[in-house]
Amino acid sequence: KLNRLRPIALENLLVELRKRTFRGKPLQEATVQKYLSVVSAVLSDAKRNEIIQKNPARMIDLPDTAQKAQAIPTDKEAEEFLNIIADIDDPYKTFYALAIYTGCRRGELCALKWSDFIVDGYEGILTISRSRSMVPGKGIVEGSTKNGRSRTIYMSEDMMNILRSYCYDKWQEALNGGFPFSDYLFTNERWELMHPDTFTKYLRRLYDENGFPKEYHLHTLRHYFVSTMLHNGVDKQTVAELAGHGDTG
């Protein structure tokens, strides 16, 4: 039934379309977007006729640059990526680890505070309730998450170990430099909040230096998180809630 169609189902459809080929070549992003436009038009008509209340096609969570394909890394590539970031400096190591372990969006990661984490034995609980993004004419603005709701994600022991190490280093940095410890996770050497683009640009260089596909970007780590959850048998409704997708009701 149309009223049971959710954004995550359409996102999975787009992922499958991008895997298809035409005359030996992958479908162009413009072609994939045309498919989505047709689906959206049908759903808009259904909304006008009060068959559905919302058009899920308009809540699709696309990367920052919609023209780029939503490629998904293999498990081997993900393992290689984790090995690579294990050797880079913070705050980048912790930022990218959180991206792949939690599936958070860039703006959500940039807005994280230490108070958003709760230690639960060797593991942890993370609450995502805000986001930081660039607004033309206003600069970086902090607001609610994309769907306007908070969500909770359980974090593995591996992720918590990375976070503990980062927290210790930040405390040492604050003590040695005479700076007050920031409420926010991701600050530079002057304890200023870092610009979201800084993480995107650094990751692009990291991808290029290590031979990852050109179509990979920061949002690719989020796609890997979602696809891994689905592959491990987590139901789509739960995955949608963990990813903070738009209409999950």
Regions found by a protein language model. Give the residues of each.
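Short, charged phosphate-coordinating catalytic segments
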Residues: 44-56, 78, 99-132, 237
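Conserved catalytic core of the tyrosine transesterase superfamily
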Residues: 12, 86-97, 123-125
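Active-site/catalytic core of tyrosine-dependent DNA strand-transfer enzymes
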Residues: 131, 156-213
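N-terminal core-binding DNA-recognition domain of tyrosine site-specific recombinases/integrases
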Residues: 1-51, 67, 88, 193-198, ...
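Conserved tyrosine-mediated DNA breakage-rejoining catalytic core shared by Y-recombinases
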Residues: 59-62, 71, 75-77, 112-171
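C-terminal catalytic core of tyrosine-transesterase DNA break-rejoin enzymes
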Residues: 48, 94-97, 101-108, 197-209, ...
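Phosphate-coordinating loops and pocket residues in cytosolic domains that bind phosphorylated ligands
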Residues: 4-7, 19, 53, 62, ...
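Long, amphipathic, Lys/Arg-enriched alpha-helical "connector/arm" segment
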Residues: 8, 65-91, 101-104, 158
